[in-house]
């Protein structure tokens, strides 16, 4: 007899709510904004004269005009001056929502989960041998040159408690990969050889752990060696702010030998103690969220990913998004190859079903709304494509710093100068901005040719590129961006510096149909007999059911039936029959409205 699955809390509504676009507006005495703007823009939003705002700054000895860009501190200052409260909001997009997403769980739903451990250390300090002992397998012998070449995840059980381990590579070539590993990690095990001490990768591992605010347990390995120097290790680590408990610090130090299987149980005890202090908990009664640890393409299985569930439960047939990839989970196995019906918080598993290979370090989320999930993944794919285009428009200069070349066009000189000034204030450690040209007027072929020659991106403010110029730019492989709000232009430049720019979409109604009659069919439920009253209705599109002017359901329109034949679309004035997926409560005179999200 099949076990009935408990209903899990969906992630969809929380994601949709947090992806809502933040509006700059004054509402109920609170001014909400996302970044800098001109005095003119601020004045319009609060329905004041620009001269009143200019006067405020004049009294401070600042000679501002209506085109002056004011920063966040000045906006806050003005709000206080005009007796408004203010609120600075971060704009959340598909580019960053997985990093900022907040999932709410009630305390009663939370239960203890397995800690996730990353083992780090300098090459040849015995990190892989320690992992080998933990896994009770012989992965060491199969690795090239004795150095781990990939990231894996494994789970063991000690004293009735599960512990998950991530094995991150231990040398400089994989520093970025190791950094990704720290994002999912609860505790870092830092392996230091007793006969070698603190080395370059030891310091890097400490930096990664501290930047991720992850506690460290030090495993001093190779204690069986005759030439060990423990005091030197304790002293060197203390200068890196890793101070042992025996030196009145708060870091646990375990002494042992992975090769001799010594100190391993003490290490497990230390992990369980640290996990208790951290109070690691999760809600298994919700849809899953977690991190991709590694992935590859298998000829027989397609995309195969090793992932760790950090919250919720993952089951076969769940639809997930991981970076710009998506798909329905076909199979779940533990890291020993055993088939699983479900993966719970803290569990590493191997899954198949994604449309392509996600990146190691990508966050994943299960979304029960398949259409919404695909939309997010497709937008993220667009972001990635833009990032690739942007990378082609950067020049690597001395010391590895990249330059983003920009050609700026605006409708008036004052605005052009103000935007240029703000652009040059933008700080980024890896990329700097170079304004190749700043001028007034429409975008011309001369601008396109200069952009092509200098690998620049063209930004226009309060101007439009004509059809001919757009075509010429596309043929020349030059990116042209236009804006009418300054802070949006600045925000986009900031995103471009990180290789990110999410596309904007608007909803377009494609058709409406009135339900004239309802038929019942035992295999599917209610069938709606409809007539198209405007536009056209297409099968498989998004739809909403409207009753007396109120939306009562949103979903997907199933296949369309005209007489005895299936139809892809039905035009105005024609009749058809259809079924609304997972919804039966339809009535005569209800309106079926179909729509699609169109990129702006």
Swiss-Prot record:
Residues 167-170 are annotated as: G3. Keywords: Cytoplasm, GTP-binding, Initiation factor, Nucleotide-binding, Protein biosynthesis. Residues 221-224 are annotated as: G4. SUPFAM superfamilies: Initiation factor IF2/eIF5b, domain 3, P-loop containing nucleoside triphosphate hydrolases, Translation proteins. Residues 121-128 are annotated as: G1. GTP binds at residues 121-128, 167-171, 221-224. GO terms for cellular component: cytosol. It is found in: Cytoplasm. GO terms for molecular function: GTP binding; GTPase activity; translation initiation factor activity. Residues 146-150 are annotated as: G2. Residues 112-279 form the tr-type G domain. Residues 257-259 are annotated as: G5. It comes from the Bacteria. Belongs to the TRAFAC class translation factor GTPase superfamily. Classic translation factor GTPase family. IF-2 subfamily. HAMAP family: IF_2_B. NCBIfam families: IF-2 (TIGR00487), small_GTP (TIGR00231). One of the essential components for the initiation of protein synthesis. Protects formylmethionyl-tRNA from spontaneous hydrolysis and promotes its binding to the 30S ribosomal subunits. Also involved in the hydrolysis of GTP during the formation of the 70S ribosomal complex. PANTHER family: TR-TYPE G DOMAIN-CONTAINING PROTEIN, TRANSLATION INITIATION FACTOR IF-2-RELATED. This is Translation initiation factor IF-2. It comes from Mycoplasma mobile (strain ATCC 43663 / 163K / NCTC 11711). The gene is infB.
